[in-house]
Regions:
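N-terminal hydrophobic segments of proteins, predominantly signal-anchor/transmembrane helices
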Residues: 30-42, 56-119, 143-144, 379, ...
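Transmembrane alpha-helices of multi-pass inner-membrane enzymes
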Residues: 55-63, 386-395, 404-438
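Hydrophobic transmembrane alpha-helices and their immediate junctions
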Residues: 229-233, 240, 257-261, 265, ...
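Long extracytoplasmic/lumenal interhelical loops at the membrane interface
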Residues: 294-361, 373, 377-380
Length: 438
């Protein structure tokens, strides 16, 4: 019997979407490169610029889009970005323009990531792919942490460092950005201790990244894979706790503790698999602290409050600087007054950075946008509920850590994916086909 011509036409029609899907998948190639190839960026000395570099193809895609959707409340963030530009007029030295440009480029790259993910089709960016990206960077973070524990004095000259002009490469700020080191060796406990920092510029960046990525690995994968694949994440989590504890990042542990308590209080939202993952995590931490020398190390850190007075001084001076220029700030962190051994005012927490650099108005806009994200992610389904938890972590971390690199981009990435998932579900429910079927 002869084939129906209608059936004959279906074969090429089915092939066309597959070819189209392959073309669309290429649009996210730079994010694949960033998350799965982050160690390469680190070796090349480009890790501090990875987000900006990978945002360029994403921006190109957005520019070519006929329509770019923007979620409600995004105007607050755009106003914050505009206020940042006004603050550049307050810079007191031309050299400060380098730091300002670097920080502003990170704000812009996070914005591009958010808009790209929010507008990407489901076939291109399913939740599984977003969570896989975060898991890959988390594994890299843990591996770098172990490198810092095992070889604390390790480091090497990066590819970028080799080609930079010597005058630029010797600049301390540039050195921090382009020279890979395994750990920051400090002696505040009375003996040298390597606090992991690889593959980031500072140990605080390592702690901030670990705190923001761990909930995604635990909760995101718990929802996607159920109980079948929980053994591997739990084994990796067990291994990660050693460099996490050795890092002595109190802000990291505070953030994770708040996340754990908050998620437990919202257990109905996070789901049964996530509750099991959270409980297993808590048990692992307690056991490690109780039966290994890591418990003694954590106790020594708690007993040694060496940094409390320094941070109090920096926070007090941040408020003082903000009072001198309450509207536009100073455009950049400022030199500390008095104790010259302390880092610049505005470098020990995102909120203090914004306050000193962009004044009370900038700080208000920044916090307002985080609260907008908190509101908009509060009632997400279990599969994307981790987005809300990341906003909570960011609200805690902003007082102690710089969020410009990994934390901002991960929060924007996961929140954008969650809000896009929520929007698609709402569109599906309100579509004529769905209504007619009902």
């Amino acid at each position: 019997m002869a084939r129906s011509p209608v059936l004959d036409r279906r074969a090429p029609a089915a092939a066309a979407p597959r070819r189209s899907r392959r073309r669309r998948l290429r649009l996210g190639w730079s994010l694949d490169l960033l998350f799965f190839g982050y160690p390469l960026f680190w070796v090349l000395g480009l890790h501090s610029f990875a987000w900006q570099l990978c945002a360029v193809p994403l921006l190109g895609h957005l520019v070519l889009q006929r329509r770019v959707r923007v979620p409600r409340g995004m105007g607050v963030w755009f106003t914050f970005l505009a206020w940042n530009l006004l603050s550049v007029t307050q810079l007191q030295r031309s050299a400060q323009l380098i730091g300002f440009s670097y920080r502003y480029s990170l704000y812009l790259s996070a914005t591009v990531v958010f808009l790209f993910v929010y507008n990407a089709p489901t076939a291109l960016l399913p939740l599984r792919r977003v969570y896989s990206w975060c898991a890959a960077l988390w594994i890299t973070t843990v591996a770098g942490g172990w490198l810092g524990v095992m070889v604390p004095n390790g480091g090497f000259t990066s590819g970028l460092e080799r080609v930079l002009p010597s005058r630029l490469a010797e600049d301390l700020f540039v050195q921090d950005l382009v020279h890979p080191s395994f750990a920051q060796v400090q002696q505040f406990l009375g003996y040298p201790l390597g606090r992991p920092q690889a593959p980031f510029a500072y140990t605080n960046h390592w702690g901030a990244a670990f705190a923001i990525l761990t909930p995604v690995v635990l909760l995101g994968w718990a929802h996607l894979n159920g109980s079948r694949y929980q053994l591997a994440p739990q084994l990796l989590l067990t291994a990660s706790l050693v460099p996490a504890i050795v890092s002595l990042n109190r802000g990291m542990f505070l953030s994770l503790l708040v996340a754990l308590v908050y998620a437990s209080a919202r257990s109905g939202r996070v789901g049964a698999n996530a509750r099991r993952a959270l409980l297993a995590t808590l048990v692992l931490v307690v056991v490690l602290l109780a039966v290994t020398p890591l418990g003694n190390l954590a106790q020594e850190r708690n007993d040694n409050q060496h940094s409390n007075s320094g941070r109090a001084t920096l926070y007090g001076q941040a408020l003082d600087y903000a009072g001198r220029s309450p509207f536009l700030g100073f455009g950049a962190p400022q030199e500390v007054e008095g104790d010259l051994l302390l880092p610049p005012v505005g470098t020990q927490g995102q909120i203090w950075l914004v306050l000193v650099s962009h004044g009370y108005v900038g700080a208000l806009l920044y916090v307002a946008f985080l609260l907008v994200l908190f509101r908009d992610t509060r009632r997400l389904p279990a599969r994307t509920s981790v987005a809300h938890l990341l906003v909570v972590v960011a609200l805690v971390e902003m007082f102690v850590y710089d969020l410009l690199t990994v934390p901002h981009h991960i929060v924007f990435l996961v929140v954008a994916a969650a809000l896009a998932d929520k929007r698609r579900a709402a569109d599906l429910e309100s579509s004529p086909t769905t209504s007619g079927a009902a």
